[in-house]
Amino acid sequence: MAAGSGGSGGSGGGPGPGPGGGGGPSGSGSGPGSNGGLGSGGELHPRTGRLVSLSACGRTARRQQPGQEFNHGLVLSREPLRDGRVFTVRIDRKVNSWSGSIEIGVTALDPSVLDFPSSATGLKGGSWVVSGCSVLRDGRSVLEEYGQDLDQLGEGDRVGVERTVAGELRLWVNGRDCGVAATGLPPRVWAVVDLYGKCTQITVLPPEPGFSPPTPIPTPPLEPLAPTEDSALAEQGTSADEAFMVSPAQARPETFPNSLESHNDFANMELSEVVSNTILSAYNGGLLNVNLSSPPAGEGLGSSGAATSPILTSNDALLFHEKCGTLIKLSNNNKTAERRRPLDEFNNGVVMTNRPLRDNEMFEIRIDKLVDKWSGSIEIGVTTHNPNSLEYPATMTNLQSGTIMMSGCGILTNGKGTRREYCEFSLDELQEGDHIGLTRKSNSALHFFINGIDQGVATPLTPPVVYGVVDLYGMAVKVTIVHNNNHSDRLRRNNAILRALSPEGALRRAAPAAQAEPERLLFHPNCGQKAAITHEGRTALRPHATDDFNHGVVLSSRALRDGEVFQVRIDKMVDKWAGSIEIGVTTHNPAYLQLPSTMTNLRSGTWMMTGNGVMHNGTTILDEYGHNLDRLKAGDTVGVVRREDGTLHFFVNGMTQGPAAWNVPPGVYAVVDLYGQAAQATIVDDVEVAPVPEPLPEGNNQVSPSSPSSGAGGSDLRFHQLHGSNAVITNGGRTALRHNCRSEFNDAIVISNRALRDGELFEIVIQKMVDRWSGSIEAGVTAIRPEDLEFPNTMTDIDYDTWMLSGTAIMQDGNTMRNNYGCDLDALGTGARIGMMRTAKGDLHYFINGQDQGAACSGLPPGKEVYAVVDLYGQCVQVSITNATGPMDNSLATSNTATEKSFPLHSPVAGVAHRFHSTCGKNVTLEEDGTRAVRAAGYAHGLVFSTKELRAEEVFEVKVEELDEKWAGSLRLGLTTLAPGEMGPGAGGGGPGLPPSLPELRTKTTWMVSSCEVRRDGQLQRMNYGRNLERLGVGSRVGVRRGADDTMHILVDGEDMGPAATGIAKNVWAVLDLYGPVRGVSIVSSTRLEESEGTQPPSPSSDTGSEGEEDDEGEEHGLGGQNEVGIIPTTLEFLENHGKNILLSNGNRTATRVASYNQGIVVINQPLVPQLLVQVRIDFLNRQWTSSLVLGVITCAPERLNFPASACALKRAAWLLRGRGVFHNGLKICEKFGPNLDTCPEGTILGLRLDSSGGLHLHVNGVDQGVAVPDVPQPCHALVDLYGQCEQVTIVNPEPGAASGKSAGTQGDMEKADMVDGIKESVCWGPPPAASPLKSCEYHALCSRFQELLLLPEDYFMPPPKRSLCYCESCRKLRGDEAHRRRGEPPREYALPFGWCRFNLRVNPRLEAGTLTKKWHMAYHGSNVAAVRRVLDRGELGAGTASILSCRPLKGEPGVGFEEPGENCAPPREEQPPPVLLSPSLQYAGAETLASKVQFRDPKSQRTHQAQVAFQVCVRPGSYTPGPPSAALGEPPDPHFSPAELEWVTKEKGATLLCALLVRVE
């Protein structure tokens, strides 16, 4: 080549690296030819990608067939790069057919011997490539958001790479240094350019010197930066930040004239972005080039410009202008625009930017809301009109000057079409969430972007000063301005995912240059016959995993250091084989080891974890150790570490599994066996594992998987430094609090410092609360990055990408999507722990005090990062992150959606038969009073519905009666929120909107099962669920059940197929589609007669079951009848079939667990019979473990049962009591039932009993805790799991009558007050348990919610469980309460408060409460809501002052038979207290004239109810005067009482004592 070509002026200088001759054009200076001209990297190597052709003496490269091919365009420099010289290319030509564009970098591979891959990202062996705005090393991303996005460069733009003398890689764009992209480059590298995607032709420009300092020696001070120049903020890898001030006379490259002004994309960064990127440490080593001073083009600081045009500083945020269309409403700090009345008006929705757009600045918006009413949609473009002086038109297309708009898929200039088919996308077809952007290039070309994809040049000539403009027209209602760092989730780097060849494509930090490469843990090249090592020793795989299941052994390249964790991530699995990955250590050097087919065949120096056991030299030493590796999935991690004390520990998903072996010698190599399903694994560098617990002093040192200690500690999750205005972050980011908590109740949102990983728990503990406000903490997750979140008052104000739990409501994007979730955050107090976790399936789970509450919602986007977010709202003031925060077991995290089959469920008890609704498909005929449905014609239009909503645990079941074999398909059934009556007239009419088939029923949310597929609103959710419904025959039964845990279950021939879907709404109807071969069905199920919507009412001897506070004769009620105990057989013993760690003794009546913490299941030989109490005593507890015994029943034959490691793993026919929860087939169906079994001390006697209706009762020390499980199938056997702390139990034969809570000879001498509510003090080893959900009905809960709305101090009421008692029809009948009782001396009758709910009040301790309850009479006093607090504060009725509760009426209230004093007369205080009206009948005292009604809205159901309040009081005999009723009543309120004694009046002070507040709700 000719030296000095291209006008360099130089001469001489061949292609070698030597200096050239001459100087610039005049023979002097420092022109390009002075250092060799083009001889140093100025040419491209003749060997190229297969589609590249070279021209212009090897300086121009063109990719052939650009319309058909997007890759194979790789070119390299002819010579290695010289340090400090920039290899620069110019983009000559681009096409719009593809996504992605030019990629550039360096490689250590010699092009003369290189086997060219299809793209630059396929280069390995020391290659660094900048792709888009990512830096990749050997195809793996090491730095994101670097420099300028190369995909946005246009024709004529220049890009170059430089290797500095310090071994750094720098990128140059249009003469601008983008900073350090990589460090540690080898001394000999070639430039590499990939003509990828849109880029089809480039030309090499003469090489130029770089601007980076060649050595770390301090540079002399440069002259100050001119006002119109930019400052480049260089963030070096390990040195301090330095700002290099570039002077045009000293450092600007001569061949890039005016480049700092004409091509400055980095000047577009807002100040907030600069600050955010500076403080973030995620991308150390990146370089930010920020222009904080230069104004937009055409508005510089020149002599004339400064005087004629206002200067807009570049750090002005790009927002919407305050002046806008007449229907526009701005919000979100003028970043969001919304058109008012979108269903009435379709125009007058024009908004403009607050300032002109700069060159190359992206103006991008996100569509937030659309409506379907209009045609046409959003329009976007630019205009030269200043918004301050513009009279806004109805639509921007009405402007006839200075306006360029994109409308549909065309371009309009001044209201007239100039390009009809500008791009493939039409703005009218975009959906909510899509992005639209535009930019004016420095060459005056206007480009539009849709979801990050450049649509090409819309117009080549755009005025220099233009404003962005958006027209919210037609369907478009709401948009928000977004910035570049907001949309990493959209299609900005479309090609990067498709071409990712490495499993390490996730976001990672660049490795420190100082890290020694040989020190990294790699796989040794000597591996199994069927294994291969790739990615520089980081990844091991079995290339033909489906052909063979073994010979996949790989070892580490060096020995492990003490305490060094070797951890791998499973990248790929196959489902052909059994077994999976195995991991361990060996003393054998991999260089000399002849590798076996599996490592368990090695008989020396080897420790391996396989399945859930540990093997040493091929022999099992621990059988049940930790999590089962065979259950792991792709993405899970396993690890191993040898501690200094010689103990070996394994890790699963970062969780330690405890010590597995002892006395392991030092210098062992890590070993991984890619066995069975495991096909590929990659070494994980940045290991984050929980700290290994210290060894216990003696005994088996395994750590139970359920132990809280196993989750302790080493998570890096903290609260982010960005938060709400009232929040304060302390304690190193682990504690968040709301200051001014008594004057501020919101603006205290805190968010996690990084995104949560799948299966990772983020748990906090409430540390401080105040009782000033209503409402409390709210918690959830958001996909909004903390840097992009403009913190609102509360997180429920966010209307996108946010999922929150508020109280019991699950809210998505500010809208309630589910009520009555399993926990209530408003009910939590100080010390409660709240956890959040997103599973790999995209489900969001909450944990309360470590207990999984089940899936709150599903469908969280799996590819989108989510951050934990906590709103310190209302009462909650301070929280801290707990040590339980961190990764959890994936299989445990998704256990609530397991699909294991459970035992066949019986149909509901006999009652009213189900019916089909009269609204049905047009081909359906209903017969036999709506219990039979037949499809009369065709194969579709066969929808039928249940007549009523399904209640919790209610089964709707049909039997197949007719088949038509000529059709294919299957019966479809499920649940829908669509009320059948909404579909119009029935009887086959089909209604106006009833679709022909169930998958098309999408007007309301519908869950359905077809064949073996689960769908929601027609969208596939699961495959391979249960039995295939296509195989149903005549006589087959199929049903659907809505579980109490908001799950949908399908039953086939009585067998539960497990949960098909979660998050089912409360109000759902059963729906069937008589589709295809199934032609006729008949109903075989019936609805329940008893209360089942809430939970079962209390049992006869429940702890809330008696009138104990006020009745000393309570022994007579609720203790006999069905509570009698059957005769205890003398042959009760444990079966010989039991867990492997059990040893039986004492005639098989004592069971002892002799090893480990599990494998301790025992079953009693005799099945349970009604009224037979079977009891066991806890003999011995080992405090080394956590958790304790599990109690329950199984209905399968125990003699042939193969017991699992723990009872909770029983997935068929099992009902278990564990802790305070009730479980069915491994799924929690109830919580907070009875006392916590994990805290029972030694000597506690626990019992199980079946009542006459099949309800399973739990007894603790002889006290019945109520019905745990209703309708247990029989026969069933009692089961005990000696788990965790419980190591020995013995069967106890109680004396007859023990079940009733009495012991022989003592009950008669015991005061009723000693047995109040069924639990004696001697049996309570902890705080009294809260009222169990199983022991309260819906009416009770409704009254309790109303009582809470009164905001009465809790100190007035008795603590649980003595707090309240329900007297609704169901509860009082189940207890057997009599309607009337007698009390006092002399005895007087009074009525029980049937239909009301009683809230017991504390008795004044100065009074002799025991005497009062026996000798005083019982009566009622009607009141109103406004008076309740004053009565409680006073402590009695009519305490000598004017009382609004006296029978003297209030103003505006009806008279009650007494004269009202004059208006200005003060009532007498001591001499004549106002009389108080009482009655022994609440029917009279609770009449509306005496107890006024008030309306309220139930916070749970949002329905309006009417409520009344009254007081139950003790009244001193002789202090009152009985008389006839004074209130005007239409009929006798209570015929049981004589009208002459229905009303009691007292005037004596101290004659009444408040006993209870009564509430009645209609």
Curated annotation (Swiss-Prot):
One of its GO terms (cellular component) is centriole. PROSITE patterns: NHR (PS51065). It is found in: Cytoplasm, Cytoskeleton, Microtubule organizing center, Centrosome, Centriole. Widely expressed at high levels (including brain). Coiled coil: none annotated. Residues 1-48, 207-236, 691-716, 1086-1123 are annotated as: Disordered. Residues 207-224 have a biased composition (Pro residues). GO terms for molecular function: ubiquitin protein ligase activity. Residues 41-207, 317-484, 520-686, 716-884, 913-1086, 1131-1294 form the NHR domain. Keywords: Cytoplasm, Cytoskeleton, Phosphoprotein, Repeat, Ubl conjugation, Ubl conjugation pathway. Residues 1-42 have a biased composition (Gly residues). Ubiquitinated; undergoes HERC2-dependent 'Lys-48' ubiquitination. This ubiquitination leads to proteasomal degradation. Residues 1106-1115 have a biased composition (Acidic residues). It holds the Pfam family Neuralized. Promotes CCP110 ubiquitination and proteasome-dependent degradation. By counteracting accumulation of CP110, maintains normal centriolar homeostasis and preventing formation of ectopic microtubular organizing centers. The third NHR domain (NHR 3) is required for localization to both mother and daughter centrioles. NHR 1 restricts targeting to daughter centriole. NHR 3 and 4 are required for CCP110/CEP97-binding, but not for HERC2-binding. NHR 5 and 6 are important for HERC2-binding and centrosomal localization. Interacts with CCP110; this interaction propmotes CCP110 ubiquitination and degradation via the proteasome pathway. Via its interaction with CCP110, may indirectly interact with CEP97. Interacts with the E3 ubiquitin-protein ligase HERC2 and UBE3A. May interact with MAPK6 and hence mediate MAPK6 interaction with UBE3A. Interaction with UBE3A may be indirect and mediated by HERC2. This is Neuralized-like protein 4. It comes from Homo sapiens (Human).
